[in-house]
Amino acid sequence: MSVIKEYRTASEVVGPLMIVEQVNNVSYNELVEIQLHNGEIRRGQVLEIHEDKAMVQLFEGSSGINLEKSKIRFAGHALELAVSEDMVGRIFNGMGKPIDGGPDLIPEKYLDIDGQAINPVSRDYPDEFIQTGISSIDHLNTLVRGQKLPVFSGSGLPHNELAAQIARQATVLNSDENFAVVFAAMGITFEEAEFFMEELRKTGAIDRSVLFMNLANDPAIERIATPRIALTAAEYLAFEKDMHVLVIMTDMTNYCEALREVSAARREVPGRRGYPGYLYTNLSTLYERAGRLVGKKGSVTQIPILTMPEDDITHPIPDLTGYITEGQIILSHELYNQGYRPPINVLPSLSRLKDKGSGEGKTRGDHAPTMNQLFAAYAQGKKVEELAVVLGESALSDVDKLYVKFTKRFEEEYINQGFYKNRNIEDTLNLGWELLSILPRTELKRIKDDLLDKYLPLVEV
């Protein structure tokens, strides 16, 4: 049994950091409790150790701390989350404490929030379909169990509504398997938190969800712990309770801002745009916790959501996220301004594992061919629209005009399904065929004749 060590040797507080001197046998990442002169308890984590000095990262901020009268206790273990199957259906704050007025959780065990490194050899390949009910994702950018597929949004775009829609609608097609959603919110406003909770409550989706809410007025440093706490809960449900867990994390930009704040307080040499040079490594410790394990029934799938500062996809946060994850869903200001919801720009969006989750036995045999044909037709239609702007519509051929018609209907009916319409994969595929029937059969060169004969609707000439 570890001995709790208590000190009164705090020498300095700088922003969210505290320096404690004359420490002995203290470990990196060790949990710290600071008892203030008025009895208030605040928590922190050992960030760095040098000789007999420890740098502590404070989760609840440093205001009101009297260095001479504060007692610092090192717990002998890292920050841990109390986990239980009863977490499902509950709402917690960013540090894992219940805030829904329900009873205290009776933990089955305590787990280190940093998780365990997954041996690459023990990973199982993602190859099963997750249905979000959103055509632009299910058909064109298929989400697969165990994948990490981020959403790149911009200022003013409805990524919160998209996140809530996915949390409400996402499911696995085999009804015999348990499915849960873990939702981690970082730096959101009170109104946004109420929106998420109300959306899940009124549809009953709260009963299969675990929510962790870090609000904008909560300490920024808490945001560093929130996604790790959420992923710890997800790993417990997936690998110990055999559930398929979808983790939605929003907004990762706020998480990275908190990292930058700590880095600045430590006076580290800044990297690109002032973010720490280890931003890539730090993000990978979150994103790489998605996946499946050999011999385990459950899976952890991630949808991290981030807002691109100034809509710049080359900004360090989306840039590094794109390197680590397996694709991206990109939201478009142009589609949003035209009234399309959700405004997913399907052409630059990508799911690198989409071919692993589609096909006979997973979705339908015509999934991949129709996906390729829709991409090709939509890209051609956008080119024709640009040509019409330059040369005028009179310069378009009859086939070009059909492509323009296809593009308009594709955006109005396929992309613009709304935030409250849940389309199953059958309905999505059938809608794709209906739109492709606008074009002459000779233009559908990416689909084999047997599939055209089977699915292409008869069109009156």
Swiss-Prot record:
Gene3D superfamilies per the UniProt record, alphabetical: 3.40.50.12240
GO molecular function, one term: proton-transporting ATP synthase activity, rotational mechanism
GO biological process, any: proton motive force-driven plasma membrane ATP synthesis
Keyword vocabulary terms for this entry: ATP synthesis, Hydrogen ion transport, Ion transport, Transport
Cross-referenced SUPFAM superfamilies: C-terminal domain of alpha and beta subunits of F1 ATP synthase, P-loop containing nucleoside triphosphate hydrolases
InterPro entries with a match to the protein in the record: ATP-synt_VA_C, ATPase_a/bsu_AS, ATPase_F1/V1/A1_a/bsu_N, ATPase_F1/V1/A1_a/bsu_nucl-bd, P-loop_NTPase, V-ATPase_su_B/beta
NCBIfam families noted in UniProt: PRK04196.1
General function of this protein: Produces ATP from ADP in the presence of a proton gradient across the membrane. The V-type beta chain is a regulatory subunit.
Family classification: Belongs to the ATPase alpha/beta chains family.
Protein name: V-type ATP synthase beta chain
Source species of the chain: Streptococcus pneumoniae (strain Hungary19A-6)
Gene, per the UniProt record: atpB
